[in-house]
Amino acid sequence: DWTFDRFEELITAVHVDLDGNGKFDKNDLYGYHDRKGFLYPLMYTAAGLKTVIEDEAGRPVFNMPGNEAFQTIYDWCDRVFYKEEAYYKQDAGNDFFVKHPMFQEGKALFSDMTFFYVGMMRDMLSDFGIIVFPKYTAEQDRYYSWVEGGAGCIGVAVTCQEKEAVGAALEALSCASMRDVIPIYYENNLKAKYSR
């Protein structure tokens, strides 16, 4: 089963001090490579946890404080990625593939990336594939992945007189995009342009 346990097994088995200098740095082999600050959200999302849920009245409430499941995932991340040194600790954000090309150089077994970056992998010497994040346990109902859409909101002017019409138009455009644009994106970009 593709679970956190199996993921841990793989990423902790491969980290090696390649240059023999006694410390893990950019010259060594790692199990996992990622953007700074993304580990924890990616893993708690993969475990099916939500930071915001609805209360009994249908209002959104913050779900993290006092939630033992989030603490369990945090402890797992801390142990596996940091204490077992399965993760290359770097300071770059979304440009980490340019600043620290560990994955492209074959120095990382796994790397998280948005599909935007998959095109940068075409020139890699090693073959690569695209997989989902693991389930927390085999009993989890399905796989979950954090989707980063690039825009959190759309601004509508305060002076707008037709808010309902604008909302309906935005919803229709989103629906059409999901139905028409995304399948073409998968076919043209992911299967042809970005992959090999």
Cite the ranges covered by each PLM segment:
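Acidic, glycine-anchored loop motifs typical of Ca2+
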Residues: 18-28
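Soluble non-cytosolic domains of exported or imported proteins
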Residues: 2-5, 64-71, 97, 159-164
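Beta->alpha turn/N-cap motifs
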Residues: 36, 113-118
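Non-transmembrane alpha-helical segments in soluble domains
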Residues: 8-15, 74-78, 100, 166-174
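Extracytoplasmic/periplasmic substrate-recognition and gating elements
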Residues: 122-192
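Periplasmic solute-binding protein
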Residues: 1, 33-58, 148-157
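Short helices/loops that flank or line small-molecule/ion binding pockets
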Residues: 8-10, 95-111
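Glycine-centered hinge/linker elements that transmit conformational signals in sensory
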Residues: 8-13, 42-92
